[in-house]
From Swiss-Prot:
UniProt-recorded name of the protein: Acetate kinase
CDD domains: ASKHA_NBD_AcK_PK (cd24010)
Gene name as annotated: ackA
Keyword ATP-binding: yes
Annotated binding of substrate, by residue: R92
Record's subunit section: Homodimer.
Family: Belongs to the acetokinase family.
Length: 398
């Protein structure tokens, strides 16, 4: 069985899967793994091999050690790199800037180009590069492919992509809307073609990727025309710990009046804000329970979250002119029926009618949650970025 190794390397963790690129969307990966607490006193490797869970705790010095130890553990259970047919390695890379609009075969030159983009993604691209360099050393004889979160949004028209800031400054420092979660938005907007009785080029879709990080996209005939995240993943919707859209003047206000440094403000807006900053939690199950218990902070946080979803929904309905379907995906989008219900409440005049019973069904594959007479079809489609990356990567092994 030909397999692709898919790597998502973070600052202190590595997520990976061994995936058959020929899998159906609902098929489980052959192996999934998580290396966490890299560089701390004690780290942990969690493997799931054909449904069986394997856990190992040990100090993990760096990404190289984490991946090597994971491969050793896989070998102990009969699925190491020398025991299975790995035909390609796909790497999730957060930021491709304006340089990369499609997956790229990784070479030394490509690595340096990704390194040059670190100022645009200082929290993510360095870790992505670590994963690339480690994997290329361990698996030097298979193609390694970079798949960029930003790639799907290279099609944004100038009116959506450019900011009203001095054009010379923007050009010098790469200031523009790049968008993120592109692999997920592209995946679910292509999957919806299987559920609609129309060719892809005739389908206008609004996609909701709602996880701890959250974004929306307007997709016209399979091509992205707008998205909520911007130059960074901080913009747009209210998120688990991120502010989403906020007046840039808040940064100046905090610097001048709270004597906060740029790094402190960065940390505040990325890690201590959003739903958690407003309510104390960023798990929507906890938030929902707090609301039912009468917690006013939780209620306020939820209302702000829903308000922002509806603002972007209205904006994208106008941008597209005609909307054929809405798609919810990712952790919150797939599992929080109350978010979907409240985000779309009262929109019957626009042809959006959610079926309450369908909406509350458990998350079990792609499904329609709108009524039969809803002009705009509403779907829940589980995202599968790993399968998408595996398929992109396998093409380079053909």
């Amino acid at each position: 069985m030909a397999l692709a190794l898919v790597l998502n390397s973070g600052s202190s963790s590595i997520k990976f899967q061994l995936v058959n690129p020929a899998n159906h969307a609902t098929d489980d990966p052959f192996v999934s793994g998580l290396v966490e607490q890299i560089g701390e006193k004690m780290g942990r490797i969690i493997l799931k091999i054909e449904g069986e869970k394997v856990v190992k705790e040990a100090p993990i010095a760096d990404h190289s050690a984490g991946l090597s130890m994971s491969f050793d553990l896989m070998t102990e259970h009969g699925c190491g790199p020398s025991q299975v047919d790995i035909i390609a390695v796909g790497h999730r890379v957060v930021h491709g800037g304006i340089l990369f609009s499609a997956p790229e075969l990784i070479t030394d030159e490509i690595v340096e180009m990704i390194r040059d983009l670190i100022p645009l993604a200082p929290l993510h691209n360095p870790a992505n590069i670590d994963g690339i360099e480690v994997a290329r050393r361990i698996l030097p004889d298979v193609p390694h492919v970079a798949v960029f979160d930003t790639g799907f949004f290279h099609s944004l028209p100038p009116a959506a992509a450019l900011y009203a800031i001095n054009k010379d400054v923007a050009a010098e420092y790469g200031i523009r809307r790049y968008g993120f979660h592109g692999t997920s938005h592209e995946y679910v907007s292509s999957r919806v073609v299987d559920l609609m009785d129309k060719p892809a080029e005739e389908i206008n879709t609004i996609t909701f990727h709602l996880g701890n990080g959250a974004s929306m996209a307007a997709v016209k005939g399979g091509v992205a025309v707008d998205t909520s995240m911007g130059m960074t993943p901080l913009a747009g919707l209210v998120m688990g710990t991120r502010t989403g859209d906020i007046d840039p003047g808040v940064v100046f206000h905090l610097a001048r009046n709270a004597n906060m440094s740029i790094d402190e403000i960065d940390n505040l807006m990325n890690k201590k804000s959003g739903v958690k900053g407003l309510s104390g939690v960023n798990d929507f199950r906890e938030l929902h329970q707090m609301i039912e218990d009468g917690d006013q902070d939780a209620w306020s946080a939820y209302n702000i979250y829903i308000h922002q979803l509806r603002r972007y929904l209205g904006s994208y309905m106008v941008a597209l002119g005609r909307v054929d379907c809405l798609v919810f995906t990712a952790g919150v989008g797939e599992n929080a029926h109350f978010v979907r219900e409240d985000a779309l409440a009262g929109l019957e005049m626009y042809g959006i009618k959610v079926d309450p019973e369908r909406n509350k069904l458990p998350n079990d594959g792609p499904r329609l949650i709108s009524t039969d007479d809803s002009t705009v079809k509403v779907f829940v489609i589980p995202t599968n970025e790993e399968l998408a990356i595996a398929r992109y990567s396998a093409k380079f092994a053909e």
